[in-house]
Amino acid sequence: MSRYDDFQAFRTRLNQRILGTGDQPGATPGPTSSPGGTLNTRRFFALDGACYKDGALDVKTKEMLGLAASMVLRCDDCIAYHIDQCLKVGVSEQELWEVFDVALIVGGSIVIPHLRRAVDFMDEAQSRRRAP
């Protein structure tokens, strides 16, 4: 499996476990589901999803902000997630490079290792989108 596939599978599996939705992403927990996280955990996940919807800022801008913040905070899973979301909403490679630049300026040289992994993930995600 590739890093991209590993990330997607891990995220899906653990989100289902945390949210108690079994095999159905987004489903309401039922009697056969594992209990998962608390109501507060589920509320936080819902708030996170709602925060990235269109508002005064569009989804594309919010995802780029999320990516820059994730790089500065040095969260590799968050970086991968936001790169994937950025590509899904039409952020160009050039725009991603500018987001990376902002993160480098704000976060400093400690961001460089995360930049390397971000570029690697971006390249793989883009190649998957181009593949038939």
Question: Predicted regions: what is each one?
Answer:
Residues 49, 66, 83-87, 100:
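Amphipathic alpha-helical segments within well-ordered protein domains
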Residues 62-70, 99-103:
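Alpha-helical scaffold segments that form or flank carboxylate-/histidine-based iron centers
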